[in-house]
Amino acid sequence: MNLFDILGPVMVGPSSSHTAGAVRIGYISGKLLQDHVVKAEILLHGSFATTGIGHGTDKALIAGLLGMRPDDIRIPDSFFLAKRDGMEFSFSTITLKDAHPNTAVLRLTGEHGRKIEVQAASIGGGRILIAKLDGIEVNFSAEKPTLIVHNVCLLYTSPSPRDS
């Protein structure tokens, strides 16, 4: 741990967990989608659900999806910017079993039809933990390069001998 971990990240406030961490969750989720986000269904759990709106968690998540970082002064305007860019988004609450109190589930759709579901938690000091990708348990912070292999099953049928 270094001095900057103790002091917390440079950020637009008010909270390193509810704002800076939420921006990072949105940012990493958008990167995992590998497409321009056009639709986001965001489910908030625990303290994200109960106090997140007052702490700007909602705006921070959208800001991250727009590619902003925690110190971006445009975070408070993220709803306006997202709507201007054509992004549809909605928020609701969810109760998750055995999840960190600052957890969000992001169901994202990209402009080319790509979809992803990310479950992530803000664990303090602006740090995050990605807990699930498309329902599969994972465990990474995105603080260091991470290789993610997405196994896609392709069905290929060859013509039967009678068809030739």
Describe the residue ranges of each PLM region.
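Contiguous domain-boundary segments centered on the initiation and propagation of an alpha-helix
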Residues: L66-H112
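Non-transmembrane, aqueous-exposed alpha-helical and coiled segments at domain scale
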Residues: L32-E41, R69, P101
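Short glycine-/aliphatic-rich beta-strand segments at the starts of folded cytosolic domains
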Residues: N139-N151
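Single conserved hydrophobic/aromatic residue that forms the stacking wall/gate
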Residues: Y156-S164
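Conserved phosphate/anionic-ligand binding catalytic regions in large, soluble enzymes, centered on
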Residues: V10-I25
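Short, hydrophobic/aliphatic alpha-helical segments
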Residues: M1-V10, A40-L43
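A structural-propensity feature for long, helix-poor, extended segments
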Residues: H45-I73, S78-F80
